[in-house]
């Protein structure tokens, strides 16, 4: 999401960095990453985002806003990549890749509390959604210069997204096709995959429900995400 020259990235699942590279995202302009919840298909590319922003001149640890436990995620990545940080620093030097800049700055988000940021006129409001058994999942309402966008995150249709989406300019809503999932179940080569494909249906919004949310919230432009299953089957 761009607000003036500043960029904010929402979720970084596997494959995100490839897309962002194709978009030629200017990493020095990226102010923060915001995580809706901590399923692997929403955080897997955080380490690559760290590397690209570090190499391209980030001047402080990468800010990551996320639910309770986001500090454990970033600490885990820092531990896993600690040798990598050291190797790159020793190879390229402090002027290029200072160790003081390596790592993350995790900040826990709270329900219905604005996220502080350094972009004039930008408001980012997290709100709780229902992705049980995920015990901390959020959507975001973003306002900038009179325009508003809501990002649902992964959720069932429990009313939260509709409440925050009333009359916004754009709704970005996750949705799954039950028909597609059922067809995938029919050809699943393993019983474990069949079970997973059955289970995921009870904590996502369907395409039909997402359309109803858009209609009832009076939002005409709606962008669907999560339509095809990621490799993690989440």
Language model regions located:
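Conserved small/polar residues in nucleotide/adenosyl-binding loops
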Residues: 225-231
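A short, acidic, amphipathic alpha-helical segment used as a generic capping/interface helix at domain edges
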Residues: 203-215
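Short, conserved loop/helix-junction motifs that constitute active-site signature segments
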Residues: 56-58, 165, 214-218
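A short acidic, glycine-rich active-site loop
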Residues: 193-205
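Binuclear metal-dependent hydrolase catalytic cores
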Residues: 1-150, 156
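Loop/turn elements at helix/coil->beta-strand transitions in domains of secreted/extracellular proteins
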Residues: 6, 218-220
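Active-site-proximal loop/helix segments of hydrolase catalytic cores
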Residues: 147-187
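Conserved acidic residues
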Residues: 31, 169, 220
């Amino acid at each position: 999401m761009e607000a003036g020259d500043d960029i904010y990235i929402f979720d970084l699942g596997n494959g995100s960095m490839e897309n962002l590279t194709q978009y030629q995202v200017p990493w020095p302009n990226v102010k923060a990453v915001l995580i809706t919840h901590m399923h692997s298909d929403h955080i897997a590319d955080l380490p690559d985002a760290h590397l690209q922003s570090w190499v391209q001149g980030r001047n402080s640890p990468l800010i990551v806003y996320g639910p309770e436990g986001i500090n454990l995620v970033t600490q885990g990545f820092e531990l896993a990549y600690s040798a990598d940080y050291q190797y790159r620093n020793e190879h390229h030097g402090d002027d290029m890749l200072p160790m003081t800049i390596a790592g993350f700055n995790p900040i826990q988000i709270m329900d219905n509390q604005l996220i502080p940021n350094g972009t004039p006129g930008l408001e980012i409001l997290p709100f709780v959604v229902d992705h049980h058994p995920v015990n901390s999942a959020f959507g975001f309402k973003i306002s900038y210069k009179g325009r508003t966008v809501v990002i649902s995150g992964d959720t069932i249709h429990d009313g939260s997204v509709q409440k925050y989406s009333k009359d916004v300019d754009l709704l970005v809503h996750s949705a799954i096709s039950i028909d597609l999932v059922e067809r995938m179940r029919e050809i699943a080569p393993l019983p474990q995959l069949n079970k997973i494909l059955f289970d995921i249906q009870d904590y996502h919004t369907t395409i039909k429900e997402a359309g109803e949310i858009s209609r009832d919230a009076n939002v005409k432009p709606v962008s669907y995400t999560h339509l095809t299953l990621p490799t993690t089957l989440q």
